[in-house]
Amino acid sequence: METADTILLGRATFTEWAGYWPTVTDGEDAGFAKWINDSPKYVVSSTLDSVEDWANSTLINGDLPAAIEELKSGEGKDITVAGSPTLVRSLLEQDLLDELVLLIHPVVAGEGRKKLFADDATLKKLELVSAQPTSSGVIIATYRPTR
């Protein structure tokens, strides 16, 4: 997250996080809370009317490729997507994703989990940039789409 200063969120992640992160002021999550609360957030949704209930939030409800191009052409650091599997899938399908970082946890999840990739998704080839194991067994895998 140190390389990013702008956050893209989908509707569900925004709705959930907007009710939580503004309330975190201390403890082990305080650093992340300050970063996410202070950073510009762009919320991609076709159903929300407003995102004013979380500071520094802007609604994107129109042409996603044009909005992403405008964000990329602006000044600042990287743009990151937090959570939001539906948004990640849409960005990948539209070739709007420059890098994909997956956290691979050493567990097998059963029902109730939303899949990142749809069964009918178009084949997208990815190039492994790095794979970093953590002390908890999580692997942080970074990929770039091949174009």
Give the ranges of each region predicted by the language model.
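Enzymes that bind and transform nitrogen-containing heteroaromatic metabolites
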Residues: 1-147
